[in-house]
Amino acid sequence: MDRCTSSFLLLTLVSTLSILQISFAQLVPAIMTFGDSVVDVGNNNYLPTLFRADYPPYGRDFANHKATGRFCNGKLATDITAETLGFTKYPPAYLSPEASGKNLLIGANFASAASGYDDKAALLNHAIPLYQQVEYFKEYKSKLIKIAGSKKADSIIKGAICLLSAGSSDFVQNYYVNPLLYKVYTVDAYGSFLIDNFSTFIKQVYAVGARKIGVTSLPPTGCLPAARTLFGFHEKGCVSRLNTDAQNFNKKLNAAASKLQKQYSDLKIVVFDIYSPLYDLVQNPSKSGFTEATKGCCGTGTVETTSLLCNPKSFGTCSNATQYVFWDSVHPSEAANEILATALIGQGFSLLG
């Protein structure tokens, strides 16, 4: 799917609802976001962690060329999704000063770069572990009740879409680089451990009142530029064993989601397949108007992420990120996020009713 087709599909979705005189904003009163760097909009700016993106060249193509803490040159897939759903403002990062008063009526973002399903890894990285993100969600609900009243707050949370992006950091930044974990878990057993934590998370946010939940699958982790550099050795193309691990994890994730769906009759849960559209972009970049899919735009594009390597002094940063599938060695560019957002919207219609 090229970028023109992607934009046309997004426009068609909005136009169809306009014809039907249905407002996405009415159907989706708020968006709550949990997880990792793929969806963090600035919470890590307020933490003593290396995993931050509140400095150039991050954000150079965002509004006012501002580095907000998003791990991207511009908009995240969730930003584009929010716009498509009729939001004129993005739900604020929960730790930011903007997360107060009426701004909370449209939701909040609790995500934290370097977080994931493995809370111990998140704590080591000085990120917000998933259990703490749930605690912030509970705190958010208390604030919302004070602003809108108990009945309205319950309605907002029940009607909100809750998005979760997690798992990539657990494998790429934790399991694959931590010999101690090898002694405790096989990759399959570690995946099962993460799935147990996923199920716990769903039950916890359900208890707070969430009823519409979308969780992203693992991407083709073996195709991330950093993974090629660190784990590819002499293998050409994507690292096949990492992609196989991701596919096996995704099968477990879908099975767990189906089980939870049966367990809670009023729960709507969708597993967004991010693997397929991103894999297609990497394998056939020119089909979608890209010229580079093996490395990121920032610096050499092979290992750069966070301030350690992707910063204003990074040598070799590209001038036009729209030609790159990846912005840094881990995260997609805004141009790629536009295509991923189309996949999110297309797969998530059941959450809008």
UniProtKB/Swiss-Prot annotation:
Location relative to the cell: Secreted
A GO MF term: hydrolase activity, acting on ester bonds
Enzyme Commission numbers on file: 3.1.1.-
Glycosylation sites: 197, 320
A Pfam family annotated for this UniProt entry: Lipase_GDSL
GO BP: lipid catabolic process
UniProt-recorded name of the protein: GDSL esterase/lipase APG
SUPFAM superfamilies cross-referenced by the UniProt entry: SGNH hydrolase
Alphabetically ordered keywords of this record: Glycoprotein, Hydrolase, Lipid degradation, Lipid metabolism, Secreted, Signal
Family in the record: Belongs to the 'GDSL' lipolytic enzyme family.
Active site as annotated: 37, 328, 331
Signal peptide range in chain numbering: 1-25
Domain of life: Eukaryota
InterPro entries named in the record: GDSL (IPR001087), GDSL_lipolytic_enzyme (IPR050592), SGNH_hydro_sf (IPR036514), SGNH_plant_lipase-like (IPR035669)
Main location: secreted
GO cellular component, one term: apoplast
